């Protein structure tokens, strides 16, 4: 069984339906671009991260990274939007669409993260990190054949985290500097 996603221009709502051996969902309510069938394995769909923890700036960054990685893996940005502000949501959604247009998904794993001292401002908190990642590019076709990787990447990043009206912390923006080559 695999999840089939149809991505592209869509003004409709998301939904799922079971039919035969595939489940299907229409994604792309926020995306623009040519329609594409995206197949996602049941294992990828089942790899749901822990629930969002948005009570502190650091926990918000961790949740953002977990849920954004999951969104990239299943080509569905909406699952991660509660961890981020609207502008960051557009950026994540655009990156998913970019990968779909290249007929690929990205499967990434955060291997390690070290948090630096936060800089607390009047409206936001800056959280510096050092991150180690492993990632692969997978085909959007049935079976999700590995197209490239696994690769490793290291980043020095700074997360701007803001508090919402509900009192949750969310990632408003990310500045990431690759330390070495990223493929």
PLM feature spans:
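Exposed beta-sheet edge and beta->alpha loop/turn motif
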Residues: 13-17, 21, 122-183
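Short amphipathic beta-strand and strand-loop transition segments with alternating hydrophobic
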Residues: 112-122
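Glycine-centered loop/turn positions within well-structured domains
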Residues: 7, 78, 167
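Juxtamembrane and targeting peptides
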Residues: 1-59
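Short coil-to-beta-strand transition motifs
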Residues: 105-110, 151-154
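Core segments of small alpha/beta cavity-forming domains
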Residues: 34-108
